[in-house]
Amino acid sequence: MAAPIRLTVPGTLRYRPVAVRVVAEAARLVSSSARVDPKDPLVLDVRDPFDTAVVSAFMEIYNNVAIHAYQRREGGMIELAITPTDRELVIELRDNGRPFDLEGVEPLDLELDHGDDSLPEGGMGIHIAKTMLDEMTYHPGPPNLWRLCKRLASQPVAGRS
């Protein structure tokens, strides 16, 4: 396994773009979709489905840590270990915020009620992340540990059907 990229940021929404930038670039290392706009090489391009899934799931979990574990208070930190390989991306987030019971998150009822245009409350971010990832685990702490894993889709082998 490759050496992880390590980053520690304050556990607030203000620092989310910093963490997202690093995660997006790590995803691009795995997907090999590093498209650079010659006019602005710093523009974040996450059009590749792998990159989009990783960034979307990561943002949901980061939001949960900042909003729920740290209760929107300053002072907490989020430690990231991001490990890109040629087949997958593994992201570990550690925080010392308030733990919670992941197993207690009820599955969402996504049946449409055409008379109600509101989104379900509670668990939406967890549902989104689980849907986007191949694996997601959570171990309450301290420290709390999230482990997110996204694998590249299998590529067909030449000469096989």
Can you say where each PLM-predicted feature lies in the sequence?
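Short, highly conserved beta-strand within the GHKL-type HATPase_c fold
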Residues: A81, R87-E92, R147
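Conserved glycine-/histidine-rich ATP-lid loop and adjacent helix of the Bergerat-fold HATPase_c
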Residues: I128-N144
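Short C-terminal beta-strand
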Residues: N144-A153
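Conserved short strand/loop->alpha-helix "switch" segment adjacent to the catalytic nucleotide/phosphoryl-transfer site
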Residues: R21, A27-M59, N63, S118-P120
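Glycine-rich/acidic phosphate-handling loop/turn and adjacent ATP-lid/helix
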Residues: I91-E121
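A short, flexible helix-to-loop-to-beta junction within the catalytic ATP-binding CA
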Residues: A69-E74, P140
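Glycine-rich phosphate-binding loop
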Residues: D116-L133
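A conserved short beta-strand within the histidine kinase catalytic ATPase domain
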Residues: G75-T83
